[in-house]
């Protein structure tokens, strides 16, 4: 018999995470590596677990993540968004606490583009009056 899986897709900055939740012990695997190997910073790893803490489902699901694009923070944010969406499939009653914690909202902030004539998005060379 096929194992029960819950899927969710999360996005943040340039990162896209495809998340699968499988009933288990709380293992997190990102791109075939353990989360400790994939994301070296504990504070960013803690961010991933927020949806489980809000819904009180910590250590009830194994998380399998395929993520690409962006850096550590973007990928962690995308994974968090994907986990929150997958938890909605588990139980639609989770919508209220997840929404209240702001975990279902896609963070729309993106990198501002570089403008011609400037060194970066907003950095200009020093202004000389005379």
From Swiss-Prot:
One of its GO terms (biological process) is translation. This is Small ribosomal subunit protein uS9. PANTHER family: RIBOSOMAL PROTEIN S9, SMALL RIBOSOMAL SUBUNIT PROTEIN US9M. Keywords: Ribonucleoprotein, Ribosomal protein. Residues 105-130 are annotated as: Disordered. Residues 111-130 have a biased composition (Basic residues). The gene is rpsI. GO terms for molecular function: RNA binding; structural constituent of ribosome. One of its GO terms (cellular component) is cytosolic small ribosomal subunit. It comes from the Bacteria. Belongs to the universal ribosomal protein uS9 family. Gene3D superfamilies: 3.30.230.10.
